[in-house]
C-alpha cells in the first residue's frame, strides 16, 4: 500500500482489479500498489465492496485513512479464512493463549516462592548429619554398656572356675593293705568258726571298693 500510481504511470492495485483507468485523485491509489495491492483489494472488494470502501475512506480524514485501510484489509483477509468469526476468532485464540500463559506464570511464581522459603541445601545436610550423630550417641553408649556387662558376666564364671581349681581337693584314701573286715563291717565278734563269710567279704571289697587292686590274703 504505497503511493498513487507507479513510476511508469500504471494503475494502482484497486484500479487494476476493477479494470479501470486510475485517475489522479483516486482514493485507493495511495494505499494499494500495483504488486500486492491487487490481492489485498480483492479481499476488501469481496467482503465490503469497492463502493462501500471508497465511501468509508472519503468520510475519514486523510491522516487516519492508512489505519482504516489496514483495518479493512485485515478484517477482509480474516473473513475469507473464517467466514463466521473473522478476526474475532483471532482475538479469542489470543485471549486463550494469554490465559494459559498467565496460569503458567502463576504456577512458576508459586514454585519459586516455595523454593525461596526453603533453607539452602548445605544447612539441610548439616542438620541431617547433626541429627544422625546425636541419635548415634545413645546407641554407642548402650552398646558399650552391653559389652561391659557381657565381659563382666564372662569374667565371673572364669573366676569361679579358677577358685574351684585353686581349692585343694581332698584325697580319698583307699586302703590297699589288709583290713580287719570284722571291724570294717561293724562286726564286734568276728566269725572264726567258718572262714567263708570272711572270704566273701574280701572278694566284695576287692571288686567294688578298691577297683580290683586289693589282693585277698590266703586263707589260713
Curated annotation (Swiss-Prot):
It comes from Arabidopsis thaliana (Mouse-ear cress). Residues 10-112 form the LOB domain. This is LOB domain-containing protein 31. Pfam families: LOB. The lineage of its organism: Eukaryota, Viridiplantae, Streptophyta, Embryophyta, Tracheophyta. PANTHER family: LOB DOMAIN CONTAINING PROTEIN, LOB DOMAIN-CONTAINING PROTEIN 31. PROSITE patterns: LOB. It comes from the Eukaryota. Expressed in roots, stems and flowers. Residues 123-139 have a biased composition (Polar residues). Signal peptide: none annotated. Residues 117-172 are annotated as: Disordered. Belongs to the LOB domain-containing protein family. InterPro entries: LOB (IPR004883).
Amino acid at each position: 500500500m504505497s503511493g498513487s500510481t507507479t513510476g511508469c504511470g500504471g494503475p494502482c492495485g484497486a484500479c487494476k482489479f476493477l479494470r479501470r483507468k486510475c485517475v489522479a485523485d483516486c482514493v485507493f491509489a495511495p494505499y494499494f500498489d500495483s504488486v500486492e495491492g491487487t490481492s489485498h483489494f480483492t479481499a476488501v472488494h469481496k467482503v465490503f465492496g469497492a463502493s462501500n470502501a471508497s465511501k468509508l475512506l472519503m468520510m475519514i480524514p486523510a491522516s487516519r485513512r492508512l489505519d482504516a485501510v489496514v483495518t479493512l484489509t485485515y478484517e477482509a483477509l480474516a473473513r475469507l479464512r473464517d467466514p463466521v468469526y473473522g478476526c474475532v476468532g483471532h482475538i479469542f485464540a489470543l485471549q486463550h493463549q494469554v490465559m494459559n500463559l498467565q496460569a503458567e506464570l502463576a504456577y512458576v511464581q508459586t514454585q519459586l516462592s516455595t523454593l525461596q522459603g526453603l533453607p539452602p541445601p548445605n544447612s539441610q545436610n548439616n542438620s541431617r548429619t547433626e541429627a544422625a550423630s546425636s541419635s548415634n550417641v545413645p546407641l554407642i553408649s548402650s552398646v558399650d554398656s552391653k559389652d561391659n556387662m557381657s565381659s563382666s558376666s564372662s569374667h565371673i564364671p572364669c573366676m569361679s572356675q579358677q577358685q574351684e581349681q585353686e581349692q585343694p581337693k581332698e584325697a580319698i584314701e583307699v586302703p590297699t593293705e589288709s583290713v580287719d573286715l570284722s571291724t570294717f563291717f561293724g562286726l564286734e565278734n568276728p566269725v572264726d568258726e567258718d572262714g567263708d563269710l570272711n572270704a566273701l567279704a574280701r572278694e566284695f571289697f576287692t571288686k567294688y571298693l578298691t577297683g580290683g587292686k586289693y589282693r585277698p590274703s590266703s586263707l589260713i
